[in-house]
């Protein structure tokens, strides 16, 4: 059997840390129409620099959503 190529694994790990991987999970379990479990998770695997850039972009998106929601709300 051939040994796994450690340089290939190192390259994959380097790319994952450089680019980052985000796994976004949403699941709901219901029994007879009654929700018994909801799972929401976001897992990020990245270098600190990549994660900070990702967090900044997510904050911009959330701020834009809040601004759009405030503009759409009718004034009293």
Swiss-Prot record:
Impact after mutating residue 24 to R: Makes short and cylindrical gas vesicles
Effect of residue 35 to A: Makes thinner than normal gas vesicles, cells do not float
Chain residue ranges for the region called Alpha helix 1: 9-19
A Pfam family the protein falls into: Gas_vesicle
Induction, per UniProt: Expressed as a probable monocistronic transcript in mid-log phase. Expressed more highly than the gvpA2 (c-vac) transcript at mid-log phase. Maximally transcribed in late log phase. In 'wild-type' cells (probably NRC-1/NRL) gas vesicles are seen at all stages of growth; in standing cultures, cells float. In this study gvpA2 (c-vac) was not detectably transcribed, while gvpA1 (p-vac) was transcribed at high levels during log growth and decreased in stationary phase. Presumably most to all gas vesicles are derived from this p-vac locus.
GO cellular component terms listed in the entry, alphabetical order: gas vesicle shell; vesicle membrane
Consequence the record notes for mutating residue 34 to M: Makes very long thin gas vesicles, cells do not float
Region (Beta-strand 2): 35-43
Region (Alpha helix 2): 48-67
Molecular function via GO: structural molecule activity
Swiss-Prot/TrEMBL keywords: Gas vesicle, Plasmid
Stated consequence of mutating residue 54 to W/F: Mixed spindle-shaped and cylindrical gas vesicles
Mutation effect (residue 53 to A): No gas vesicles
Region Binds to GvpF1: start-end pairs: 1-22, 2-43
Signal peptide span: none
Result of altering residue 24 to Y: Greatly decreased interaction with GvpF1. No gas vesicles
Applied value in biotechnology: Can be used for presentation of peptidyl epitopes in the mammalian immune system. Purified gas vesicles when conjugated with 2,4,6-trinitrobenzene sulfonic acid (TNBS) yield trinitrophenol-modified gas vesicles (presumably most modification occurs on GvpA) that elicts strong antibody responses without the injection of extra adjuvant.
Subunit comment: Major component of the gas vesicle shell which is 2 nm thick and consists of a single layer of the protein. It forms 4.6 nm-wide ribs nearly perpendicular to the long axis of the vesicle. Modeled as antiparallel homodimers. The ribs form a low-pitch helix rather than a stack of hoops. Interacts with GvpF1 via its N-terminus (residues 1-43) in early growth stages, none of the other GvpG1 to GvpM1 proteins were seen to directly bind GvpA1 in H.volcanii experiments. Might interact with GvpJ1. Might interact with GvpG1, GvpH1, GvpJ1, GvpM1, GvpN1 and GvpO1.
Name under which the protein is recorded: Gas vesicle protein A1
Lineage: Archaea, Methanobacteriati, Methanobacteriota, Stenosarchaea group, Halobacteria
